[in-house]
Structures are given as structure tokens and as C-alpha cells.
Amino acid sequence: MSLIEGLLQTSSTVTLLGTVLFLLVLYLRSSGSSSEGQGKEPPGPRPLPLLGNMLQLDLKKPYCTLCELSKKYGSIFTFHFGPKKVVVLAGYKTVKQALVNQAEDFGDRDITPVFYDFNQGHGILFANGDSWKEMRRFALTNLRDFGMGKKGSEEKILEEIPYLIEVFEKHEGKAFDTTQSVLYAVSNIISAIVYGSRFEYTDPLFTGMADRAKESIHLTGSASIQMYNMFPWLGPWINNLTRLKKNIADMKMEVTELVRGLKETLNPHMCRGFVDSFLVRKQTLEESGHMDSFYHDDNLVFSVGNLFSAGTDTTGTTLRWGLLLMTKYPHIQDQVQEEISGVIGSRQTLVEDRKNLPYTDAVIHETQRLANIAPMSIPHTTSRDVTFQGYFIKKDDSEWESPHTLTPSHFLDEKGGFVKRDAFMAFSAGRRVCLGEGLARMELFLFFTSLLQHFRFSPPPGVTEDDLDLTPSVEFTHNPSPHQLCAVSRV
């Protein structure tokens, strides 16, 4: 364990005082060059030197702290995460105004030190400027060509479902952790779109990539990495950062090897996936004399890494929340399975069935809303000086009738039909809206309905529904706390 991580885990008063003094020296050393911004800034709690407002923050549920502060300061206010000043937008209407109505102003990504270490300004998720615009445009066009969110995606998901069901069946109704099997199933969908083929769950290259991506997301949310984001000069003393950098190096090596194999068998007239399309575009530009385009190896490797990580953790985590919530609330599971049995019977569910399964669709949307796996999203930064709404705006009234419970009726009308809600922003909005939204919606619907069609989910022996803990695990995304479920065959 490193010095910094050891300090973070101790409760000794002497050590804590020593830590504060140690960090204060570093703060004084680094803060001399800071300058005040021009004009009146949004209100907020007064920050302490070095620590900012961190003593007011619930580290397990920081979004709860920020929501409470919005009641006092309004829907736009300032909060200091250590020495870093952040403007917080609270409430659906305010967020929509910024990300949609003023998309150009709020469309850049705030790239923290750890994410710069990950991507070096390349790829799709953690980049800005012309390179990001070109990579996102290329990704949107080509991922659609390979069926993301369309019939091609549906075929890939339907191909994967039997493999996941087989893994669940092997447990023969005994309690097990769904994390790994769900991770591999979802990872295979993006693998098929990016590389052109799926992997076996026993393939060490594939399992290594998937497990490493999951671990990296977990490490990114650790206290020591958040400390590094605030004080980058602490990097040499943070073990988690060393592990993350090794994971990124391994990812680059593995993606490079996979790309090399695809390059050797590349047919420009028959692209198998995203990588093939990128290689063809790169080759075409180079042959025409454009040697300094954005289509270079780093953008390819990091774009693939971004797609793989973003396309697996969020969807897989949401699906696991769905299974846990069905176990926690068996009466809702009953209604979902009754609807599936009445409409689908024993045949395979298809995307076109969604319109005839309004209750199931509502439960999936409500799972996304309640699980709220990225409650603070990924930080944005303004692309220029912005005047926004003025300050001390009255906080939005709650957009949800029962915000803290699983309530499918949030997405149902009085006749039981599915209804969209404007405040549902599970995929963000504006220029940075999730480019895989169509695919993720399709995966959640097909995987969820297929699993509920085949299995009855219940707590392990000796555990009641009330014992199941819905407190999320504190990571970069909100994962369910460690748990096991029983999947008993209904067929």
C-alpha cells in the first residue's frame, strides 16, 4: 500500500493532521499562479484553503450533497472539489438549457488528469477540438453502418443471449454473482461491432480485456485517484495510479495486436467492423498524400478502448441492477413475467415486441432512472466565457412522483401504455449524448426480457427480499453492492 493510500485509510488524528499539513505545503507551493476570473461567479459555500468544500461532501453519495446545496444556492452554484472550482447545474430544466439549448458553450469535456493519462487527448470520450469532432462523426456514421441500434445489432444480441442463458443455467438455481457473466455477454456485443466477431467466454484475451476494463473503472472512482485528480503531483505515491497505467498499457498492446491481425486480412470492399472502416479510411488518406490526418494509430487504439469500456460497464451495470431490483421486488417481477408470457410466450423476444410490452419497457426505464449509475455524468467544461441564467434560480420541483422507489408508473399513462418522460436523461444530452444509446436500449430490452422469460430470480437461501441492499458501491459508476442471486429456470 502506498503512502497516500495508507493515509486515506487511517483514522488517526495525528496522521490526519499530518496529512493536512503535508497537503497544505503542496497547496501553497502550487496555488501562487492562480488568478481570479472576471465577473460575478455563481454562489456557493465558502471554500477552505486546499480542501475547498470537501468537508461538506458525502464521499459515498456526493450527488446527494450537491442536491441539498442546490436548495440553498439555486440550480447553478459553485463547489470547490479541493482546489478545483466547479460550477454545478442541478435539475432537469437547467441541465437541458445548458447541454441542449447552449450545446456549443457547454459541449467540451473537462479532462481530469487521470483521463488525460488514459487517452492523451485522443479517442472519443476524453478529447476536445477538431480531433474529437472528426472521431465522433466517424464513429457515429460507421457504427450505424454496422448496425448499432438497428437490425444488425439485434442479430448480434440474439446470437449472444443463448450463451448467457447457458451460463445462468449451469448454476442450477444455486446462488451466484452475475457480474462476470453479464460483463462478458455485453462486452461481446461491442466486440462484434468493433472487431467484427464475438469471443468465447473462456478466451483469455477477451476475458483479460473485459476484466481489465471493469477494474479500471473501479479504480478510477477510488479515493486515491480522486486525490490525484485534485493534486496531480501526488501521482508517484499512488499505487492505484500505477495499476491504472499498467492496465492502459496492456489495453494498448492487446488492441494493437487485434488490429494487426485484422489489418493482415483486410478487404477494403468488405469491412467487418469499426476497426476495418478506420483502417480503410486511414489507408485512403495516406494514399492521397494526407499523412497528418486524425486517422492515426493513437486515435484508433483509444477510440476502440473508449467504445469497449463505455459500451460494457454502463449497460452491464444497469442490467445487473435490473435483476437485483426484480429480486428485491417480486411483485414487480411477477407483472413483468406475466406480460412477457402473455405477449411472447416461449419464442425469442424481438425488438419489435417492445411496443407490446409497455410494463416491461417501463420497468427497464425505471431501473435506469432509479439506479442512476452516473449521477453526476462525466464533467463538461465551457468552450468560452458564458453568461448562463443568472444566479439563485429557484430549484426545479421534483420531476418524479416517487423519486426514491422503483415505480414503473413513472413511465405509464392511465391506460397502462408506455409514455416517454422529458426528464429521463440516462444517456445525457447535447453534443456529448451517448453515441451508443440505440445499442444500449436494445441490449437492455433484449437481455432483460430474455432472462426474465427463462428464469425466476430470488434471494439466496436464508436471505429475504428486505435483506437485499440497494446501496450502490462507490466507484466511477454506481454498481450494485456485492450480492448473489438465484436464477431458477421457468422453462
Curated annotation (Swiss-Prot):
Keyword Ligase (UniProt): no
MF terms in GO: heme binding; iron ion binding; oxidoreductase activity, acting on paired donors, with incorporation or reduction of molecular oxygen, reduced flavin or flavoprotein as one donor, and incorporation of one atom of oxygen
Taxon lineage: Eukaryota, Metazoa, Chordata, Craniata, Vertebrata
Key word Metal-binding present: yes
UniProt xrefs under InterPro entries: Cyt_P450, Cyt_P450_CS, Cyt_P450_E_grp-I, Cyt_P450_sf, Cytochrome_P450_fam2
Topology versus the membrane: Peripheral membrane protein
Family listed: Belongs to the cytochrome P450 family.
Gene: cyp2k3
Binding site for heme: 434
Cofactor: heme
Catalyzed reactions per annotation: an organic molecule + reduced [NADPH--hemoprotein reductase] + O2 = an alcohol + oxidized [NADPH--hemoprotein reductase] + H2O + H(+)
Keywords annotated in UniProt: Endoplasmic reticulum, Heme, Iron, Membrane, Metal-binding, Microsome, Monooxygenase, Oxidoreductase
Gene3D superfamilies, sorted: Cytochrome P450
Protein name: Cytochrome P450 2K3
Location(s) in or outside the cell: Endoplasmic reticulum membrane; Microsome membrane
PANTHER family, per database record: CYTOCHROME P450 508A4-RELATED (PTHR24300), CYTOCHROME P450, FAMILY 2, SUBFAMILY AC, POLYPEPTIDE 1 (PTHR24300:SF319)
